[in-house]
Amino acid sequence: MQKKVKVKPNSKQQKIAEQDDGSLTVHLKSPPVDGKANEELIKLLAEKFAVPKSHITIKSGLSSRQKLIEIDTDI
């Protein structure tokens, strides 16, 4: 399954909000430095979708706030 994700780093609290179009807005505490925000994003999405972190891949937008995430739910 693929999801469009808008990331908001340096937030005060972690939060995942689903938008009307099915995309996600994810608020992260980590700064967008050295991949820390991407690591936190993968960890949060793994918890939300109950899959291992290895089943989540950032397909595009590695250094952007707009990302396309691939979630392998076939366990």
Curated annotation (Swiss-Prot):
Cellular component terms (Gene Ontology): cytoplasm
Pfam families cross-referenced by the UniProt entry: DUF167 (PF02594)
Origin: domain of life: Bacteria
Chain intervals for the UniProt region annotation (Disordered): 1-32
SUPFAM superfamilies in the record: YggU-like
NCBIfam families: DUF167 family protein
Similarity comment: family membership: Belongs to the UPF0235 family.
PANTHER family: UPF0235 PROTEIN C15ORF40 (PTHR13420:SF7)
Protein name: UPF0235 protein Ava_3894
Taxonomic lineage from the root: Bacteria, Bacillati, Cyanobacteriota, Cyanophyceae, Nostocales
